[in-house]
Amino acid sequence: MSDYFEEVMRKLTIEDVSILGWLFQNEANAVFKAIKKSSIADELEYSTANFRKTLNKLEAIHFIGTVTGGKEHKLYLTEYGQQAVQQAIHHGEENEEVEEI
């Protein structure tokens, strides 16, 4: 299972990681902390098509969840999304240590 997760992580794009990182920094890590899609789109300034494509991918691999029922949909990091961000941070720290040596 961890091999599958590693493979999914390797295939993330810069846009994918940016959205995951933005949600992580803004602590959108639970349904009740979800943030409006429009707020995220305004902040990241991706094209509408690219933003939609990226969200669809992240939702399909269960890294983000969508809260519906209000006027506007909201997004949050799922447990898998949180693990992905934490793993990316960990790998970044390991790479920094290697560069220092």
UniProtKB/Swiss-Prot annotation:
Give a yes or no for keyword DNA-binding in this entry. Answer: yes
- Keyword Membrane listed? The answer is no
Q: Which GO terms describe its molecular function?
A: DNA binding
Keywords per UniProt: DNA-binding, Plasmid, Plasmid partition
- Provide a GO biological process annotation: plasmid partitioning
Subunit structure and binding partners: Homodimer. Dimers bind to DNA, forming a protein-bound filament which may form a helix around the TubZ filament.
Reported function? A DNA-binding protein that is part of the type III plasmid partition system used to ensure correct segregation of the pBM400 plasmid. Binds the plasmid origin of replication, probably cooperatively, forming a ring or short helix with external DNA. Its effect on RNA expression has not been shown.
Name of the protein: DNA-binding protein TubR
Organism, by scientific name, is Priestia megaterium (strain ATCC 12872 / QMB1551)
What taxonomic ancestry is recorded?
A: Bacteria, Bacillati, Bacillota, Bacilli, Bacillales
